[in-house]
C-alpha cells in the first residue's frame, strides 16, 4: 500500500480556504514547502504527519462483484477442469462435493 498521497490543486485550495476561515496561520506551513524540491516535499510531508494511506472507495456494485467472485470462484475452477478433461477422457471422474469454504 502506498504511504504518501499527492493531493490535487483543487483539494489543496479547499484546504487553504478552510484554514483561513478557521483563523489558523497558513504562512509558516506554505513557506516551508515552497523552498523544497519535490523529493524533499515528499519526505517533509511523511515526517511532519501530513501523509495518509491512499484509500480507494468501493462502490456497491464493485463490492457486490468481489463478494460474488469469492463464492463462485472455486466452483468455476472445478467446472473448467471438468470440461477440459471431457475432451480427453470419457467423463468427469471427480466427485461432486461442495467447496470447503462454505
Curated annotation (Swiss-Prot):
Q: Which keywords does the record carry?
A: Chromosome, Developmental protein, Differentiation, DNA condensation, DNA-binding, Nucleosome core, Nucleus, Phosphoprotein, Spermatogenesis
In Gene Ontology terms, what is one molecular function of this protein?
DNA binding
* Tissue/organ expression: Testis.
Say yes or no: keyword Phosphoprotein present: yes
Q: Does the keyword Transcription regulation apply?
A: no
Q: Which Pfam families match?
A: Protamine_P2 (PF00841)
Where is the protein situated, by its record's location annotation? Answer: Nucleus; Chromosome
**UniProt PTM:** Proteolytic processing into mature chains is required for histone eviction during spermatogenesis. Transition proteins (TNP1 and TNP2) are required for processing.
Q: Name one GO cellular component term.
A: nucleosome
Residue(s) carrying Phosphoserine: 8, 10, 37
Q: Where is the composition biased (Basic residues)?
A: 49-102
Please indicate which superkingdom the organism of origin belongs to: Eukaryota
Q: Where is this region: Disordered?
A: 16-102
Q: Which GO terms describe its biological process?
A: chromosome condensation; nucleus organization; spermatid development; spermatogenesis
Identify the InterPro entries for this entry: PRM2
Q: How does it assemble?
A: Interacts with TDRP.
In the record, the note on similarity to other proteins reads:
Belongs to the protamine P2 family.
Chain's role: Protamines substitute for histones in the chromatin of sperm during the haploid phase of spermatogenesis. They compact sperm DNA into a highly condensed, stable and inactive complex.
- This chain belongs to the protein called Protamine-2
Specify the species.
Answer: Hylobates lar
Q: What gene makes this protein?
A: PRM2
